[in-house]
Amino acid sequence: MSQDPERDDVTASATASASASAPASASAHYSGSSLSVRWVQGFPSQNVHFVNDQTICYPSGNFVIFINLETKKKTVLQCINGIVGVMATNVPSEVVAFSDRRFKPVIYIYSFPSLTRKNKLKGDILLDYTLLCFSYCGTYLASYSSLPEFELALWNWEASAILCKKSNPGMDVSQMSFNPMNWHQMCLSSSSAMSVWTIERSNQEHHFRIRSVKLPLEDATFLNEPDMLFPTTLPKDLIYGPVLPLSAIAGLVGEEAETFRPKDDIYPLLHPTMHCWTPSSDLYVGCEEGHLLMINTETLKVTVLQKAEEFPLPDGAPLINPLTLVYQKDGILASGIDGVIYSFIIKDSKYQVKTFLEFDGPVTHLVFSPSYKMLLIQTDKGSVYIYTFGAEMPLDKLLDACDGKVQAVSFITPGTKYFLTLTSSGEVSTVSLEDCNCTSRIFLKTQATALACSPSSPTAAVGTVDGYVYFLNILDVESPQMIHQAFLSQSPVKIVTYDQRGIFLLVGTEEGNIFVIDARPSKSFQIFGFTETGKDILQISTVSVMESDVVEVLVLYPLPDMGRSRLEYFTLPVMLPEVVPENFSDERGRLKDDLTHKYLYEVEHTLSSAVLGFTGSKIFGFCSQVPYICSYVMPVKEHTGVLVLKPHQKVQSKQYGSGTIYLSSHGLWLMTIAKCGILCIRDMFSMETFVRCRSHSHQGRGIQNMKMSLDGQHILVNGKDDNTLVCLKWKRLGANIASEIFEHSRPLVLHLSQTVESESVYLALSRESTNEQQEETTESQKHLNSDSSEEEAVIDHKMIPWIQQKMEEAIKKEVRIFSPRRKEIKRGIKELAQVIAMMMEENEKVDIIAKLDEQEFCLDADELERLHDECEEEVAKIRKDVEMHNLAQSYLTELIKEECWNSMAVKGRALKCFHIPYVVDNFPMKERTEEELQELSKVMQQKKTEIECLKLRKEIVEVQATTTIAKKHHEEEEEEEEDEERTIKTTSLPNYLLGSLSTDFGADTSLLTSQLDLHSREEKINQIILLKDIIYNIKRNFNSEFDAAYKQKEIEIARVKEKNVRIAEIISDLELEETVWQPVFEDSEKPERALVVEDDEISFKKYIAPWQRAKIKEVVSTYEMERLQQARISDERQRGLMDMMGGVLEVKKEDILRMVIPQPPFMAKADALWSEDERKQFKEYEKKVKELNEERDKYRKSLEAELKKLQNSIQESTQNFDDHLKRLFERRVKAEMVINQEELKINNIIFSLLLDEELSSREQFLNNYLLKKQEEKTKTAEAIQKAREDLDVFKEHHDMLVAEDKILDRSFKKEFSDILGHQVDVLYKLFKRRPRVHKQKTQADVTSLVPYGERPGSAKLNKENLAQLMKSMDELDNINNMPEGLDPSVWEHFCSTRRAKVENEYKVKQKAACLLEMTTFLRKRMEEDDVVHHEIEKVFHELIRLQDEKVRFQVNLTVQILLKQGQVELENFQLMLEYSDAILINKNIIEDLNSVIRTQGQKKVASMMESKEVHKGIYQIEWEHKKMEMEMEDLNQRAWDIEMLFFSRDRQKYLNEPNYENVIAIQIGIMEQTISVIDKTHKKNVENCKKLLKKLGKYSNQKDVANYTLSCNLREELVAVSERQDICNEIGSKLTCEKIARERYDNQLKQQKLLNISKQQAEQISILQAEVERLRMKTFPALIPM
């Protein structure tokens, strides 16, 4: 590796060394070998930049590629430290800056075209730079970094120093640019914000000043946001306290309070995408929403440009969403995702849109060349176009990017001229190896995965994702053709490789099949068969040497479950194409094992790559988890099964990440690549590295693949993610190494050339026949359409994979063999189908319960099992869903029950009346926690202590007051007792001051603080705790009353139930149809019923498991047996009772109503047939019936009376309960009212506490903000002090330079005093003469094209101007310009003096410009200091106002007052907002006063009405009189006007002219033209005035500098005057006026003389000093130290 300090990190050209020297332990055979970069192919993923007018550059991988637009020649600059990060160019200085992407990245500055490193910029950035930007003027470079710093830094790239930097946390910038007109302004934009940065300089100090741009809303309107820090529009609320900003309400006290916005107040803004600068230092900004903005960078005013006319967009096209903008004269060019470049012509605040160019894909970048003759256009794919203005063919395609990422590369045999590249989208390109130019392309229109070129024929094979292998004819590299395609399987093709002699093509798929195909196109790429291996094949390695008759194949695939890798080794005989297919593969295309001789090996660790050595049966493997390369020796003996290989040799790879190992064409080199991006070439025997080259980096995930040509002279390396292809060549290669590879490649190339020639002839003939067939097909398609079905059939046949075709052929063969047996099975199936059909018909006729499903008749056991499994899965899924739903509902039930039932000490329930619709609810209550009880006891103890302290204080005061009067001790004791009673009374406040009726419920309010005394936070919190205790006690007291009423209702219901038993008996005895009224508790009265589910509430039948059904059946049968036995016993008892006693054990009184006297049997006969005895018996029977009826009536009346009595008692008891519950309801309403009153007090106190917290938050924020501003004030004061000191020092240097310049001017004649006077005058004229510095004139067309015109120069240009000035001085110093008669030595002395004078003047000019800049810097720092000071004063005023409001809030308390019934508040409460003078008085007094006032007011109104009528009549008469006078005046005036009527010429013209409107229109047109001319003249005058104002501004600045100088001089004069005044004051007035005047006169004369003498001496001294200096300079070389 190069050790040059200028090239320690970056290699500066394509021919620079890209490799390191061999290790010390390597063989001397390979010493001195190294690789270098030949060329690099990559397409831009970042923006392309111009380095000069004819060269562009862009980064690609580890390289920066430069392209000359005229010659198309490429130059490469390599970054050894890894992938190139961001890049920028500076056209005036022709330098390139780019960063790397390592930890703590570095920025490199390179000059072009020498590509030498000028500087290396090291900052404090940890991760990555995201943006770089050069200023057009000056040596400034801006860099921006992302996470974690978000830092903008300004560099002096020539001095490698950071001038200033500033961090912006969270600001992710997408574009950064300098103002092209000056380096003082920058613009940073992201998708959500824009900011303008101003760089201010004071000598060597630089300072950033940031200003954010307020973007419009998404609809292009502007939002006026109020000041959230110090709002001035907040409403005033005199009742509820001060209204504070939202940040204080949110409780924010830090920096977040400054930018806090509620979610509802945040509106979506426009999203900038790109911006560009104008010559007037304005900004054009494009937005995602399609709007175009113009921003004035001085005022930050945003203008939304409007379309002058609607631009028609294509159908379905989106809005013009510019991805990039570039400025041109009178407008901009913009491009978007639609691939169209639009030209915007902007005038004032409107623009017109025109289509400039159209492309297929989105255009991502536009940039003009420095001369603005060319426009560079870059697409999203990486293609680059150059549009040359004024050319015949303006659009030129410079870079044609590939369609997708490069997947693979392969040399076209022998690998000395061309190679192929394959992209992921299926694009195959033929590229020249000499200059990397693309010769041809072919699109396969499918996703491709692998590529390989055949060594034995001019063909290539491409593997695709859909399982195809396409064969390409590359005999003619300018027009490749697809000649064959093989659909192997539906699995994607992963690896395609040829053996070294090009006999076989091996294709590996993802599913683990390796297909063996004949590589010769003359054999139509015959597929020999496939062999099965493991999935995810990593690599297929082959060994095919000329001396061998077999091709050895090694396949590597992983065993992830075992953490190992498996190797499969098999051989393919060279004579395989001549063998009959049945001998090497079976019917399904699988290669036979006895032909391939397959062996399995395993290694104990995972390998990412493995290759097979040419000799010694060696395997070389690259370990994936450890950095080692191992070699394994395959045993000579045959084996079966899997053999574990042990490492034979192990070498540390010194490469990190998984890699791939390759074998050179002669088999002596091992080439390894890895994720680190380093290519290592090793000796096969020692496995030591002798060449190491870093072409890619780990940031781009290293190298994907590499290829070496047959002669070993060229190596292609393809990156994985950086899309960069690098061609390496040998920079130094030993003669022995070259001879080795030449000796191997020559016979191989000779052998292959014979096969290539024969196959080329076949391909050429097949190409001609294919062309003829295509022509015939084209003609036939015009006439015949009947063959389309046959072509589609062929295509359909081709869509079947080869492996499936083989499978189908094998199946067809098996079908032919087993066809008789098949027919028998089909016959049996048909008979079985008929039987099943009959069974299904019978099934349709049975009942629904007995009917079977159609699935039950399916005889397919697998199908039945599948359906059964599906049903089981569905049932299990439903069961799981139901269980989860039930579990969720159960969990929710438990939560609700725990929260609303279990946690309640008093459950909520209702109580209803029996007869009236009154419902009384109790108060549900939770048990107070231990913490609440402790707080309550603490507060109560504190309040009791305070009361006791108050009593003791009063006692102490009273004792002290009565110590002087000892005689009245007894009276004092009585007074003390009265005071105690008074204290006890005053502790309980009256209800109207207490604010509630809580005392009516027995609440103890003696501990409550008066509402007029609640000031401190602690008192308010204690008051809340006490009020909550009062509410709790009120609820508890009411609940006790409710519980008593509830128990009473239970008793009443029980009593009614007892009485209803007797009532039911009476009703049944009386056989009445009345219903018994039975009161019951409802669900609201018994809420616990909701937690219990009764059986009658369940509508679904309960599911009983089979094992439970048997158990239930046993229990039911046992119960039925017992019931039958009990019924049998009861039946026997009943029959015995009926037989013995007629069914009655005891005759009761209730039985009278049911008693019936049986009729004698003779009553069935007629009366005439009765006997006397029978008649007597009938009389006795009638008597008994009469007596029974009388007894029955008496008993019925007694029952009715008893029934009425019971009903009345029930009605009375329930009515009494209803009355009691009615009173309880009123009590409930009152209790709720009292609770609401107490809760209202609590809410008021909580509101006051919340407002107090808001005030404290606001105060804390203001204090923090004040501290922040004070720190800013300190910093600005320090900056002012430092700037002032620097200005004073610099001004002193400037004054010294000015003084030296004046001395040089004044001492000129004395310098040349020894020559003649006229010669001195001539020389002085020449001394004042200055050369004209000719500016480099640009061409007129270039000046007209460049929109920015001539821009101010940089420091480099200033140095060039000085050099040019000195060069012009050489012309003036020519001897030909010497006056006649002048000594040449004098002329030389004159020239040196004049040159010194010119240099000094240039220095003075530079110093004056720097002095003006420093003065401006100081003025801006003072302005910033004034702004900060104003903000500090504002904060102080806000703090004072806030403290006043806080005090006012603490004093003005919200008091809750009870009003009597009938007293209401005023609706318009704003009538009286100040209650400082208000008092509470009795309502009756006010009503009496109002009645008196009302009576007196009525009397006054009556008298006023009477006087009003009189005044109204007087006013009416006066009004009529005035009206008549005015009408008279109007008539007189009208008569006079008629007499003096003026009839002008215009009126005459109007009457005489028939087309008066046309005349007026002509006059209006003339006036409009006049107005337009006046308007143009006015605009010109305005422009002239603006120019004049600019000149006056510059003149004013000059005058300011002069005034500043004069003010400094005036300050010195004032000091001198003050000193003289002090001296005069010390002398005093001791002498007389005459003497004093005389002395003054003498002193003035002496002073005048002394001044004259001092001036003369000063002039002489200055002359002598100049002479001494001249002599010293003249004789300095000859001076000898004493």
Swiss-Prot record:
Residues 926-960, 1171-1223 form a coiled coil. WD repeats lie at residues 168-207, 262-305, 315-354, 358-397, 488-527, 697-738. Expressed in testis. Expressed in the lung, brain, oviduct and nasal cavity. SMART domains: WD40. Keywords: Cell projection, Cilium, Coiled coil, Cytoplasm, Cytoskeleton, Differentiation, Flagellum, Repeat, Spermatogenesis, WD repeat. Its main location: other. Belongs to the CFAP43 family. It is found in: Cell projection, Cilium, Flagellum; Cytoplasm, Cytoskeleton, Flagellum axoneme; Cytoplasm, Cytoskeleton, Cilium axoneme. Residues 767-790 are annotated as: Disordered. This is Cilia- and flagella-associated protein 43. The gene is Cfap43. Disruption phenotype: Mice are viable and show no malformations. However, homozygous males exhibit complete male sterility due to severe defects in sperm mobility. Sperm from mutant mice exhibits teratozoospermia characterized by short, thick, and coiled flagella and sperm axonemal defects. Females are fertile and give litters of normal size. Mice display early onset hydrocephalus and severe mucus accumulation in the nasal cavity. Flagellar protein involved in sperm flagellum axoneme organization and function. Involved in the regulation of the beating frequency of motile cilia on the epithelial cells of the respiratory tract. The lineage of its organism: Eukaryota, Metazoa, Chordata, Craniata, Vertebrata. One of its GO terms (cellular component) is extracellular region. Gene3D superfamilies: YVTN repeat-like/Quinoprotein amine dehydrogenase. GO terms for biological process: brain development; cell morphogenesis; cerebrospinal fluid circulation; cilium organization; epithelial cilium movement involved in extracellular fluid movement; establishment of localization in cell; flagellated sperm motility; motile cilium assembly.
